[in-house]
Amino acid sequence: MSLFNSANKVIGGVLKFNPSKYQVRYLNLHEYQSKSLMDKYGVNTQKWRVVTKASDAIKAASELNGELVVKAQVHAGGRGKGSFIETGFKGGVHLCKTGKEAERLCDEMLGKHLVTKQTTKEGTKVQSVMLAESVDPKRELYFAIVMDRKYGGPVMIASPQGGVDIESVAEETPDLIFKEPIDIVKGIRPEQTKNLAEKLGFTGEKAKIAQQQMENLYQLFIKSDATQVEINPFAETTDGQVICMDAKINFDDNASFRQKEIFEMRDTAEEDPREVEAGKFGLNYIGLDGNIGCMVNGAGLAMATMDIIKLKGGIPANFLDVGGSASEQAVTEAFKILTKDPRVKCLLVNIFGGIMKCDIIASGIVNASKQVGLKIPLVVRLEGTNVNIGKEILEKSGLNITSASDLDDAAIKAVNCLKK
């Protein structure tokens, strides 16, 4: 699991997020896609092949040497300990020695839904499997480069405790987490990579190799507009090589206009279709597991809304930020997305009108309710610019809309709707 996913799991101390399924304005790649990118920048990886049909596994295996590792390709961690819904087959990562074994393993995985600690209970459908040459690591280390607001730019993070849950290392032995902030203008300095290589236990020629790998990973990070390049394990092998065995690379969506080749690798089948649809209309949507649908303007207000719903005994079904200048069409599309979720039994709209005027939102709510044929309770709290006009529009709409005086009142009314 990534050291940097934890912030996506808790909001206000009460809501747990699923990092594999929730939109965080980053593009995620499959492991084989990340390896392809690393190969381009001179980063040492195992030789690998990817297959989408089990019948191709024997040929792919023949192009590789020695023992093979067969890995299901999904955007989720914990694959090795996962299981497949359809057959109960255990593990999305296996070792094998022959092409025939690889074919059997691919047949067990392809087209099946893999459930891990980072997926929903429905799992994620495996549509590709990577075969790679197995590496015998002498030491498994950890290395990452991430954008960190605390440092105002990229920072290298390393630990001699790799190949395991790095979050546990950070919690239990924080003294084994080493950081080196990078000046975004001057770039990475040799003394920084030398310092980290030494702290990771590299000496002599191996230290120079490790330093070069860190430099190559930084070039990948900076030239491809990555927000995170995480290598776990960053391994020293028994034959003296330094290999990046597993990688997680994220990219800022804002860089899509100049990283077209990378963004063409996006696998929307791995994403919540509601999130994909919301993105088309500039809506920031994250699906959760509750039954109170939320539509709010502003990320902070949206999180506060979810927290208060939870505190009042309800469970939010989503995070949905319509932004500061959403159109009536965007509001309508937001309603369509929310009402497509069969778990949603009540909608709560919480708008603080600044740039976005309350009368515009009110008109959008009325039109959206009519278009989708809304049949579930709707609670609306409006405040700010043109609030009185907005409330009047709602009152004259003839729709079954419950107005709330403030956020606390709105949360209570939404929760009470579910008790009727």
Curated annotation (Swiss-Prot):
Gene3D superfamilies: ATP-grasp fold, A domain (3.30.1490.20), ATP-grasp fold, B domain (3.30.470.20), Succinyl-CoA synthetase domains (3.40.50.261). Pathway: Carbohydrate metabolism; tricarboxylic acid cycle; succinate from succinyl-CoA (ligase route): step 1/1. GO terms for cellular component: mitochondrion; succinate-CoA ligase complex. Pfam families: ATP-grasp_2 (PF08442), Ligase_CoA (PF00549). InterPro entries: ATP-grasp, ATP-grasp_succ-CoA_synth-type, ATP_grasp_subdomain_1, Succ-CoA_synthase_bsu_CS, SUCC_ACL_C, Succ_CoA_betaG_euk, Succ_CoA_ligase-like_bsu, Succinyl-CoA_synth-like. Residues 35-263 form the ATP-grasp domain. Binds 1 Mg(2+) ion per subunit. It is an enzyme of class 6 (ligase). GTP binds at residues 46, 78-80, 135. Its main location: mitochondrion. Keywords: GTP-binding, Ligase, Magnesium, Metal-binding, Mitochondrion, Nucleotide-binding, Tricarboxylic acid cycle. Its EC number is 6.2.1.4. Its cofactor is Mg(2+). Mg(2+) binds at residues 232, 246. NCBIfam families: PRK00696.1, sucCoAbeta. GTP-specific succinyl-CoA synthetase functions in the citric acid cycle (TCA), coupling the hydrolysis of succinyl-CoA to the synthesis of GTP and thus represents the only step of substrate-level phosphorylation in the TCA. The beta subunit provides nucleotide specificity of the enzyme and binds the substrate succinate, while the binding sites for coenzyme A and phosphate are found in the alpha subunit. Heterodimer of an alpha and a beta subunit. The beta subunit determines specificity for GTP. This is Succinate--CoA ligase [GDP-forming] subunit beta, mitochondrial. It comes from Dictyostelium discoideum (Social amoeba). The gene is scsB.
